[in-house]
């Protein structure tokens, strides 16, 4: 990792940036508030650079050049902006516009909400700018699209209030936010303390009881599946295809070395299940 990138990452830890606000809003598919807290408090392992990240940085000038060519607006770079704990790493400014460059393998049916949140966050640094543009290059077909994000001062104020509260409540206080997933729990508590005991509250006792029921049900289902698999295999013997009296294919079983495969989708479809069952699964 280059010294410049290390410095950039260190600066990001000093506050909430555009990609961070989407995490706090629950929009990010990549990180949770626990991930963010571990990062901001210096507890997270450095995220290694990867080919996708490098490609995005390398293509950014090309995306911005395409934007300038298509819109006729010149673009300029301004670097990192800091307003207390609020941080913005804006890709570029154009006349009357904040511009964020994105690359994606495939096109979008709609702009990902975490990108919209990022641009809205950046608009908060420029009171007179009413629109942010997401300039997106799609690598699969080389197409280029511009998606505008209109300023909403109420949303920006809410974002800043949320960021301030979260920063004070968790980063300044050095208290982890509530975990949202099993992965969060593993990240927060990487090892247990021998012989340490906690008393289960009512909700947890209910979960333990439900877990026992579900595991017992899962075992029953697994045993039932195995029983029916055996019945089909025993009937097929060395045949590859099983059909009904009308000749319609019910199942196939191919054995290659030590592997076996039964086409259970074909079995299910041949049994003409009700539409409600299909919809439920």
Task: Write out the residue ranges for each language-model feature.
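Nucleic-acid nuclease catalytic cores
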Residues: 53, 69-167, 171
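Extended, charge-rich alpha-helical segments
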Residues: 212, 219-281
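Short amphipathic alpha-helical face segments that pack within enzyme cores
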Residues: 62, 117-121, 209, 216
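Short, hydrophobic/amphipathic alpha-helical patches that form generic packing surfaces
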Residues: 35-39, 124, 208, 212
């Amino acid at each position: 990792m280059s010294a410049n990138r290390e410095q950039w990452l260190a600066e990001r830890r000093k506050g909430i940036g555009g990609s961070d606000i989407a995490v706090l809003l629950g929009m990010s598919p990549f990180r949770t508030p626990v991930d963010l807290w571990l990062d901001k408090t210096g507890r997270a392992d450095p995220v290694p650079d990867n080919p996708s990240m490098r490609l995005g940085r390398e293509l950014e000038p090309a995306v911005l050049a395409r934007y300038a060519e298509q819109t006729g607006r010149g673009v300029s770079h301004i670097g990192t902006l800091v307003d207390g704990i609020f941080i913005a790493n804006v890709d570029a400014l154009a006349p009357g516009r904040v511009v964020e460059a994105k690359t994606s393998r495939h096109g979008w049916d709609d702009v990902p909400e975490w990108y919209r949140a990022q641009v809205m966050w950046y608009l908060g640094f420029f009171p007179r700018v009413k629109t942010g543009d997401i300039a997106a290059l799609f690598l699969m077909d080389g197409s280029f699209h511009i998606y505008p994000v209109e300023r909403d001062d109420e949303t920006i104020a809410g974002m800043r209030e949320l960021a301030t509260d979260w920063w004070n409540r968790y980063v300044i206080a050095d208290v982890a936010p509530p975990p949202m997933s099993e992965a969060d729990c593993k990240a927060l508590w990487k090892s247990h303390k021998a012989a340490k005991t906690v008393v289960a509250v009512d909700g947890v006792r209910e979960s333990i009881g439900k877990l026992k029921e579900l595991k017992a049900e899962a075992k029953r289902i697994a045993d039932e599946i195995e029983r029916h698999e055996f019945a089909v295999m025993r009937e097929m013997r060395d045949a590859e295809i099983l059909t009904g009296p009308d000749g319609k294919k019910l199942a196939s079983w191919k054995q290659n070395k030590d592997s076996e495969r039964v086409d259970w989708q074909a079995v299910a479809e041949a049994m003409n299940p009700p539409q409600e069952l299909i919809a439920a699964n």
